Curated annotation (Swiss-Prot):
It is found in: Cytoplasmic vesicle, Secretory vesicle, Synaptic vesicle membrane; Synapse. This is Synaptotagmin-A. Residues 1-57 are vesicular. Residues 96-145 are annotated as: Disordered. Keywords: Calcium, Cytoplasmic vesicle, Glycoprotein, Membrane, Metal-binding, Repeat, Synapse, Transmembrane, Transmembrane helix. One of its GO terms (cellular component) is synaptic vesicle membrane. Binds 3 Ca(2+) ions per subunit. The ions are bound to the C2 domains. Residues 141-387 are annotated as: Phospholipid binding. The keyword Transmembrane helix applies. Homodimer or homotrimer (possible). It comes from Diplobatis ommata. InterPro entries: C2_dom, C2_domain_sf, Synaptotagmin.
Length: 427
């Protein structure tokens, strides 16, 4: 009995032994995993070794490789930063748009009301302009006229000598045409329709309210005076370019009472462009050394010369005369520049002029067109020195005020006949 019971107990105990195979399976799996891990580790090491070998093959020093790596990292960081910033800005803009849309949202009724109010306001403005008799163009013209300034002058007539006496007293509230916020004004005075005789005041530097106090005489018989018109044009002087006209005042002589001296202010109006034939401009410098009695004239260049040849060009050269009392003392000339209307010379000429004579001489500059066959025709002329006016007088005065220093200036060429008449030259 005891043996049978023990046998049965042994049989009952047999099912409790299955955990042994699972442990063995786990052990085998762990062993396999460890083998795979070892293989992965070996493969990683091999990749690193290959990478380092490839790096060693590159013909660059280690510090260069380090620098490249640093630059790459910095670029990556900056790209990330920019992307983050853009995302944040987009979110902010969306929020702002929503807030504005909520606050400033308009209905169709609001739009219609705004349209009606705008139309009503425009009609009111038009009615106001109609009442005052002004259009928008008129307003602009008035503003332009106001900016031109005004001129004070006097008029008198000498019946015994048949002379019209014009006094240019002063100007006020002139516009600023120079960079420094001022102008260099002077006044041209002439009588229409002939324009034969023109006068110019002295140039006043850096002022918008110049005081001239200069008088000019025109010899006109009283019987012819009624058909004349006096023109007083204010200009802004510029040494290196064309003088800008500021404005002008026109006075028909048949509207003036010459029974007494007339003195009045006139607002300057927009001046008409002078329709004078353009002969060109010339630039030259003047230098005077008083101790040596040496006057140096450098002919620099000319521009926009009149076309004298059939082909639409010229062969210009320049003559320089030193004159006194209508007599030519010395003569110089430049080289000839072929087929051009804008010649460049940069040629220097010297004259001996004692200090006591410098105020009595004149330098006459003539631009001529060279011709092989016929006579060389004069294109234009200008003179500085004694008896010169306006820009020419200013150039001469600046030279005397700055001894030993070359003073360059552009001059507009005048017709030869007019200059010769002023100089009293005999051909």
């Amino acid at each position: 009995m005891k043996l049978t019971e023990a046998y049965h107990d042994a049989l009952a105990a047999l099912p409790a032994t299955p955990p042994l195979p699972t442990a063995v399976a786990n052990a085998t799996e762990a062993a396999a995993g460890s083998e795979e891990g070892k293989q992965d580790g070996f493969s990683k090491v091999k990749v690193k070794e290959k990478f380092m070998n490839e790096l060693n093959k590159i013909p660059l020093p280690p510090w260069a490789l380090v620098a490249i790596a640093i630059v790459a990292i910095i670029l990556g960081l900056t790209c990330c930063f920019c992307i983050c910033k853009k995302c944040l800005l987009k979110k902010k803009n969306k929020k702002k748009g929503k807030e504005k849309g909520g606050k400033n949202a308009m209905t169709m009724k609001d739009v219609k009301e705004m349209g009606k109010s705008g139309k009503e306001q425009a009609l009111k403005d038009e009615d106001e302009d109609a009442e005052t008799g002004l259009t928008t163009d008129g307003k602009e013209e008035e503003k332009e006229d106001e900016k031109l300034g005004k001129l004070q002058f006097s008029l008198d007539y000498d019946f015994q000598n048949n002379q019209l006496i014009v006094g240019i007293i002063q100007a006020a509230e002139l516009p600023a045409l120079d960079v420094g916020g001022t102008s260099d004004p002077y006044v041209k005075v002439f009588v229409l329709p002939d324009k034969k005789k023109k006068y110019e005041t002295k140039v006043h530097r850096k002022t918008l309210n110049p005081v001239f106090n200069e008088s000019f005489i025109f010899k006109i018989p009283y019987s012819e005076l009624g058909g004349k018109t006096l023109v007083m044009a204010v200009y802004d002087f510029d040494r290196f370019s064309k003088h800008d006209v500021i404005g002008e005042a026109k006075v028909p002589m048949n509207t003036v009472d010459f029974g007494h001296v007339t003195e009045e202010w006139r607002d300057l109006q927009g001046a008409e462009k002078e329709e004078q034939e353009k002969l060109g401009d010339i630039c030259f410098s003047l230098r005077y050394v008083p101790t040596a009695g040496k006057l140096t004239v450098v002919i620099l260049e000319a521009k926009n010369l009149k076309k004298m040849d059939v082909g639409g060009l010229s062969d210009p050269y320049v003559k320089i005369h030193l004159m006194q009392n209508g007599k030519r003392l010395k003569k110089k000339k430049t080289t000839i520049k072929k087929n051009t209307l804008n010649p460049y010379y940069n040629e220097s000429f010297s004259f001996e002029v004692p200090f006591e004579q410098i105020q009595k001489v004149q330098v006459v500059v003539t631009v001529l067109d060279y011709d092989k066959i016929g006579k060389n025709d004069a294109i234009g002329k200008v003179f500085v020195g004694y008896n010169s006016t306006a820009a020419e007088l200013r150039h001469w005065s600046d030279m005397l005020a700055n001894p030993r220093r070359p003073i360059a200036q552009w001059h507009t060429l005048q017709p030869e006949e007019e200059v010769d008449a002023t100089l009293g030259m005999k051909k």
